[in-house]
Amino acid sequence: MSTRFPINSTFLESIDKLETGVVWVLKNLPDDAFFTVGQIATDWDGDPKAYGDRRKHPTIAPHDHLGNAGHHGHWWGVVTNTRESSGTPIEQSGKGPDQPYEHYMISATKLVDQRFKENDVRRWTDATTVPYVALPNSRRSMIKIGLKTGCYCLMVNLQSMMYCFGIYADSKAKRGRMGEISKRAVDMLGNQDGSILIVVFPASGQGKGTIPDEQTIQSK
């Protein structure tokens, strides 16, 4: 069961309201950070074994439901042969570091490593190795104060009070929800069930073309 956490808004200003709650900034430091509370949910995007067609390949065991990546004629979460959502998902060859897992699709994320091509799994932010947060797409309130892909964030499990730092590496379509975090972040926070405090630091990070490793992220 999730718990609602009261917030004293004396020194805070609301900049947005999502399905999961209000987004706040400090009144005296409105551009330094924003925060909100959401429900913890696991994001597998970027994981080389996140998605695959089990009807076509019964021996594979994808970590996430294929429907979370799209459907025939409209794929938003995996790389296709045409690089368009209407294309056919590329299946890994199982050969080499670029496509190591045969028959699995190539799961995409918002944050990329520009050194690698789109059909290379190393281009995408792996949910199993990088602690990251997924934010709602195109929220003007967040963009206005400097939110960019790759920004650093702090995540706190409000049940266990365990915390970790992460990056903004994925986006969640049109739904105004917070709390979806990478599998690695879930593991670091120690509990998948409950509420999470997410503090995002706009205009931080290394930018859209670089994926920092976990050690770099936790040193911030």
Where are these regions (language model features)?
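Short, solvent-exposed secondary-structure boundary/capping segments
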Residues: 174-184
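Cell wall/extracellular polymer interaction/catalysis modules
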Residues: 1-162, 166, 175-176, 189-190, ...
